[in-house]
């Protein structure tokens, strides 16, 4: 397995990995780098069966999540609800068979942001099954963004002094078929509070935020006044999605990405071929570890 560092300084690329025969050293790197560096892109070139992909994901996580409150149709059969279809493909009744099947934009978000740390999966793993070329998924780096945010001179009144006390409440329902705010809801997001500034399993500190699910800001148990809600949301959305904190992954079939779901968001620009594109998605958990000794800054830069 060969590791290279993206020119942006944080995304790790993986080449020359036999995903059907991952050794213990490779597995350890695939389990830790998505937390220290937030995104790992494996440029796999061999097609996988669902059993092979299921086996791969079971190896890079301690456990896989299987309790998403969604319709049966989105789960890949015989995977214990651990593998989900992400596609706009329709069945014989005209119903979309996977998550997020609309051709228009899928806004910046992370999955089920209101769930507690004990329940919520740490990371997602996506595999490009077919017809992915031309599709883009964007990812963010809130570790670096938080460092810069603390030094910002143009932040709205009260935001910076409240950062470490800030909580977000998510009370969200939305359709995984036809867009986040569609009326035909087939998925009920679970509600709850989470810290705005938090840590992932590696000990890295960053920002946990998901603007698609309409978060409400609280300081402790006190809601931020309406004017502050609006100003803070607008400022943070623009700040956290600046190009310097974003990576646009241009999909090719058979590639695999693993992305931290505590300190990173993802989004998908409009894609007209969504009815043919198919991704498989797994979400999982790892045990806490000390990521401070992991230094990818010495890796060769990817050309």
Q: What does each model-found stretch correspond to?
A:
Residues 2-39, 44-253, 262-303:
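Non-heme Fe(II) oxygenase catalytic core, chiefly the N-lobe of the double-stranded beta-helix
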């Amino acid at each position: 397995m060969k590791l290279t560092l993206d020119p942006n300084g944080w995304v790790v690329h993986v080449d020359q990995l036999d995903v059907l025969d991952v050794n213990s050293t490779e597995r350890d790197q695939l389990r830790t780098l998505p937390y220290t560096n937030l995104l790992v892109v494996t440029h796999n070139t061999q097609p996988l069966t669902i059993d092979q992909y299921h086996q791969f994901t079971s190896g890079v996580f301690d456990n896989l999540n299987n309790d998403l409150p969604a319709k049966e149709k989105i789960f890949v059969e015989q995977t214990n609800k651990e593998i989900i279809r992400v596609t706009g493909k329709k069945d014989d009744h005209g119903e979309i068979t996977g998550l997020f099947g609309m051709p228009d934009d899928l806004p910046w978000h992370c999955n089920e942001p209101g769930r507690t740390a004990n329940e919520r999966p740490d990371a997602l793993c996506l595999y490009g099954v077919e017809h992915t070329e031309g599709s883009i998924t964007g990812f963010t780096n809130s570790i670096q963004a938080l460092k810069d945010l603390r030094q910002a001179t143009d932040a709205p009144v009260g935001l910076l002094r409240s950062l470490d006390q800030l909580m977000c409440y998510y009370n969200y329902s939305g359709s995984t078929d036809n867009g986040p705010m569609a009326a035909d809801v087939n998925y009920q997001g679970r509600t709850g509070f989470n810290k705005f500034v938090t840590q992932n399993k590696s000990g890295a500190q960053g920002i946990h935020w998901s603007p698609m699910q309409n978060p409400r800001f609280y300081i402790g148990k006190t809601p931020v006044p309406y004017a502050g809600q609006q100003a803070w949301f607008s400022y943070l959305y623009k700040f956290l999605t600046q190009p310097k904190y974003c990576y646009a992954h241009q999909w090719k079939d058979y590639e695999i990405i693993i992305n931290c779901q505590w300190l990173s968001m993802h989004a998908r620009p409009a894609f007209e071929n969504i009815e043919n594109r198919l991704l498989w998605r797994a979400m999982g958990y790892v045990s806490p570890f000390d990521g401070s000794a992991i230094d990818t800054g010495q890796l060769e830069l990817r050309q």
